[in-house]
């Protein structure tokens, strides 16, 4: 594996290998050392979970880590990201974890610079978030063994969600039994990679084994899509009542950050079925597996 850009570029065997390797790291705490590998984290969008878990993963693997401070870098002088990477590569940095608001940027960088560096996509616009898909699936397979028997529901702004895009793809690759995308009509995607779409919350959650709740982007909700916040809250929020339509042992997940009282109630987020902090924990090990796969190849 030269780069880690999209789930669609991986085989099901590669994905399964990453899942098993992540769980191995989690349960054995036996980590290889890659002290000769240098990695830079370039986050052009704000991040807490992804940025810190990538850095922890890198340090667990004994990599040399460079965190680029964009506010004090030449980016403030108008330097193109392509030139920034070329400059850092000339200093000996081989691996680049990049988050950016532009769809497809990491793939473009890999196409231009791929002979000399390794690009890891930490999220590009509304397009893809592949490491989130890996960690989410690690969390699911840790508790639910037979993916082909599962019904998984994703709830929220599917149309603008890079998390939903990557998760659809990984479900398709691994043969998940059923995937339901629950969203108000204005947030439904024009094209679905895998699964079916509904605007009926209770029907979509009926019998679900896993429920993934997406963050409501309140700034987009109010300004761009003209969807009333109270309407969303009343019809699509994950509450104790709506969760009751899922199976009693259904897993509740959320990629974070959460808007408590908007897309998810605190009673659900902090309840016995919540696996949200387990996702955060697994994010470190999933990203360790991704990095190791790149280095080993």
From Swiss-Prot:
Listed EC numbers: 2.1.3.2
Ranges that cross the membrane: none
The UniProt record lists the keyword Transmembrane: no
Enzyme's top EC category: transferase
PROSITE patterns membership: CARBAMOYLTRANSFERASE (PS00097)
Biological process according to GO: 'de novo' pyrimidine nucleobase biosynthetic process; 'de novo' UMP biosynthetic process; amino acid metabolic process
Superkingdom of the organism of origin: Bacteria
GO cellular component terms given for this protein: cytosol
Pathway of action: Pyrimidine metabolism; UMP biosynthesis via de novo pathway; (S)-dihydroorotate from bicarbonate: step 2/3
Residues annotated to bind L-aspartate: 77, 162, 215
Sequence positions that bind carbamoyl phosphate: 49-50, 99, 129, 132, 256-257
Keywords from the named record: Pyrimidine biosynthesis, Transferase
Sample GO molecular function, one term: amino acid binding
SUPFAM superfamilies xrefs: Aspartate/ornithine carbamoyltransferase
Role played: Catalyzes the condensation of carbamoyl phosphate and aspartate to form carbamoyl aspartate and inorganic phosphate, the committed step in the de novo pyrimidine nucleotide biosynthesis pathway.
Subunit comment: Heterododecamer (2C3:3R2) of six catalytic PyrB chains organized as two trimers (C3), and six regulatory PyrI chains organized as three dimers (R2).
Family: Belongs to the aspartate/ornithine carbamoyltransferase superfamily. ATCase family.
Name of the protein: Aspartate carbamoyltransferase catalytic subunit
Organism: Legionella pneumophila (strain Lens)
